[in-house]
């Protein structure tokens, strides 16, 4: 899995002008699923995300997790994280998982996250508009195959 984590003051995702999910303080996750991803990748990503200390404590140090601040997650599927830009000027997305597998793993990922924090989400495969107010900004890239 490839994920982009953005610390936000607020974020929302809309489809056809209607809000599908919205959060206040927390994390916006852009989630890409690869063809070789499995339950271990999901567990690793969930463990990292819910325990990562990227929120400020009373002294202004990044020392608190999303659980500590009782924050929320907005999860948005994004196969374009698997873009291959080596040839030409049009990205290829053949490195992303097929939609059936990706949808299944994305759903499972969100269900596992929801065991720890409130999770709002977009709609898998939909054309979505994402709005956010970055906090920091703090943006972290997580690749479950690089640990």
UniProtKB/Swiss-Prot annotation:
Pfam families: Tyr_Deacylase. GO terms for cellular component: cytoplasm. Belongs to the DTD family. The keyword Ubl conjugation does not apply. Homodimer. An aminoacyl-tRNA editing enzyme that deacylates mischarged D-aminoacyl-tRNAs. Also deacylates mischarged glycyl-tRNA(Ala), protecting cells against glycine mischarging by AlaRS. Acts via tRNA-based rather than protein-based catalysis; rejects L-amino acids rather than detecting D-amino acids in the active site. By recycling D-aminoacyl-tRNA to D-amino acids and free tRNA molecules, this enzyme counteracts the toxicity associated with the formation of D-aminoacyl-tRNA entities in vivo and helps enforce protein L-homochirality. It is an enzyme of class 3 (hydrolase). InterPro entries: Daa-tRNA_deacyls_DTD (IPR003732), DTD-like_sf (IPR023509). A Gly-cisPro motif from one monomer fits into the active site of the other monomer to allow specific chiral rejection of L-amino acids. GO terms for biological process: D-amino acid catabolic process. A motif (Gly-cisPro motif, important for rejection of L-amino acids) lies at residues 136-137. Keywords: Cytoplasm, Hydrolase, RNA-binding, tRNA-binding. NCBIfam families: D-aminoacyl-tRNA deacylase (TIGR00256). The gene is dtd. It catalyses: glycyl-tRNA(Ala) + H2O = tRNA(Ala) + glycine + H(+); a D-aminoacyl-tRNA + H2O = a tRNA + a D-alpha-amino acid + H(+). Gene3D superfamilies: D-tyrosyl-tRNA(Tyr) deacylase (3.50.80.10). This is D-aminoacyl-tRNA deacylase. It is found in: Cytoplasm. PANTHER family: D-AMINOACYL-TRNA DEACYLASE 1, D-TYROSYL-TRNA TYR DEACYLASE. The keyword tRNA-binding applies. GO terms for molecular function: D-tyrosyl-tRNA(Tyr) deacylase activity; Gly-tRNA(Ala) deacylase activity; Ser(Gly)-tRNA(Ala) hydrolase activity; tRNA binding. Its EC number is 3.1.1.96. It comes from Streptococcus pyogenes serotype M12 (strain MGAS9429).
């Amino acid at each position: 899995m490839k994920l982009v984590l953005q610390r936000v003051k607020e974020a929302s995702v809309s489809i056809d002008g209607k809000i599908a999910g919205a959060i206040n303080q927390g994390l916006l996750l852009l989630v890409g699923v690869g063809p070789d991803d499995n339950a271990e990748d999901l567990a690793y990503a969930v463990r990292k995300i819910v325990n990562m200390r990227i929120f400020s404590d009373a002294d202004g140090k990044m020392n608190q997790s999303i659980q500590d601040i009782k924050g929320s997650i907005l999860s948005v599927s994004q196969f374009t994280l698997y873009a291959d830009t080596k040839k030409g000027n049009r990205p290829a997305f053949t490195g992303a998982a097929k939609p059936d597998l990706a949808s299944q793993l994305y759903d499972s990922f969100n269900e596992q996250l929801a065991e720890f924090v409130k999770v709002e989400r977009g709609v898998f495969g939909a054309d979505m508009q994402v709005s956010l107010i970055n906090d920091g900004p703090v943006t972290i890239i997580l690749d479950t195959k690089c640990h």
